[in-house]
């Protein structure tokens, strides 16, 4: 297209592509608000992620919090939740954290992943997404999770996961274990936390197809 009509051509092409979408014309998109992120000398805090930087060891300890409440019963409730919907919020925050550590913390060569929360709640969110995968918004959220995990997979850092009592490496979060170069699982409980739930891993259907690596293998 000539430069004089380039902008109009782009708009026309985008409109034609949008018409092919299966998203109902009455549906509204979600506004992605700026991420809430606080950066300190050795700490980065998001809503669902806390990162502690151990500069002496060149390691970033990345603690991911599982969902605080169960997902809605109906897929129609996801849109009103906007970017606060846990899987979408988590994907955005992990994506941002990966890029921040890659670009701004080049001396941090090891990323150590921890999780904390209720694995049953993580599984419930996975089930909601999978049962409604044909919904346009759910599909986009799953694709966002897939892209984010691919970005992690190709990051030139040593990836470690620590599977500890009270962790929730279930379904989508189990992908962190599968992507890691090394994983360590504690057998038993910490002496000062006898009330904790023993460490466990729990796959869901999210681990068997929807989230392939860059090579196409799950």
Question: What is each model feature region?
Answer:
Residues 2-157:
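Intrinsically disordered, low-complexity segments enriched in small/flexible residues
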Residues 1-28, 134-218:
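Conserved catalytic cores of soluble enzyme domains
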